[in-house]
């Protein structure tokens, strides 16, 4: 029988996935595909010129000390929708912080829709998430990030923990949007404040950067009326923020908004499985 030595670092989930695409014969095709560790990328068949990429964490969730790195490079003229196989679960951390870093590059006349399903935080989870995006002057980009502070239907609640979310979006090298969210220690008490989430436990941020700002804004605003949220467009970007009592209520608003920002296209099929 082998006994682990005292002080041995517990096994951690680590992974790195990279996808690069090119335009070939009028369709988006693979240029590079790399997978390492717990990171996997699957490419379902599509019936148009676009590509759909489903990223998977085979570890089934993350806890303190785990790390996942994703990168996407959309070449000129390509179209890529990136989503996740399921909601990412962030479990209680006994030590350390789980990290997820995503880097996206969108070339000339290309579009990337970053559409991961919700991240579910459990009590005493610790997560630092980063999103870095570089856009060509003529590129389009849509990002959606939704978070659940526990699953209300399961009786779960996040009382304490750490969640940091950092976005940096650049166009032609110039910063056009930055996010810096931090929920720490007394998460439940912080979320209860009216200036934060007003007691809601499900929330989402959506960002669109591209030439259809005004058209999309006119479609989105009626969809968020009557909910806890809002939509604004300025400086070449459209930002939507939503909050709801639970994940189901959030999806009822979120999915129509995503579709509106995709010119009527539905969310990826894996969202409905």
Swiss-Prot record:
Protein family: Belongs to the UreD family.
Known function: Required for maturation of urease via the functional incorporation of the urease nickel metallocenter.
Residues in coiled coil: none
Transmembrane segments: none
InterPro entries recorded: UreD
Gene name tied to this protein: ureD
Location, primary (coarse class): cytoplasm
Superkingdom, taxonomy of origin: Bacteria
Name under which the protein is recorded: Urease accessory protein UreD
GO cellular component, one term: cytoplasm
Keywords, in A-Z order: Chaperone, Cytoplasm, Nickel insertion
Cellular compartments annotated: Cytoplasm
Known partners and oligomeric status: UreD, UreF and UreG form a complex that acts as a GTP-hydrolysis-dependent molecular chaperone, activating the urease apoprotein by helping to assemble the nickel containing metallocenter of UreC. The UreE protein probably delivers the nickel.
Single GO MF annotation: nickel cation binding
Any Pfam family the entry gives: UreD
């Amino acid at each position: 029988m082998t006994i682990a030595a005292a002080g041995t670092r517990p096994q951690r989930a680590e992974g790195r996935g990279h996808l690069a695409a090119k335009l070939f014969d009028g369709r988006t095709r693979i240029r590079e595909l790399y997978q390492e560790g717990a990171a996997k990328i699957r490419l379902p068949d599509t019936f148009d010129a676009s590509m759909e990429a489903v990223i998977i964490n085979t570890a089934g969730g993350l806890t303190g000390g785990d790390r996942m790195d994703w990168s996407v490079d959309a070449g000129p003229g390509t179209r890529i929708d990136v989503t996740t196989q399921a909601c990412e679960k962030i479990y209680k951390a006994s030590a350390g912080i789980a990290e997820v870093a995503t880097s996206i590059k969108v070339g000339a006349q290309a579009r990337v829709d970053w559409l991961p399903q919700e991240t579910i935080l459990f009590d005493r989870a610790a997560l630092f998430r980063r999103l870095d995006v570089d856009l060509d002057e003529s590129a389009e980009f849509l990002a959606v990030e939704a978070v659940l502070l526990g699953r209300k239907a399961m009786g779960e609640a996040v009382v304490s923990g750490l969640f940091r979310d950092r976005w940096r979006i650049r166009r032609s090298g110039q910063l056009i949007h930055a996010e810096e969210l931090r929920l720490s220690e007394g998460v439940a008490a912080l979320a209860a404040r009216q200036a934060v989430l007003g007691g809601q436990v499900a929330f989402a941020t959506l960002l669109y950067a591209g030439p259809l700002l005004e058209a999309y804004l006119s479609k989105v605003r009626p969809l968020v009326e009557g909910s806890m949220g809002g939509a604004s467009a300025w400086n070449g970007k459209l930002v939507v923020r939503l909050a709801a009592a639970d994940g189901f209520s959030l999806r009822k608003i979120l999915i129509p908004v995503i579709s509106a920002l995709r010119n009527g296209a539905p969310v990826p099929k894996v969202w409905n499985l």
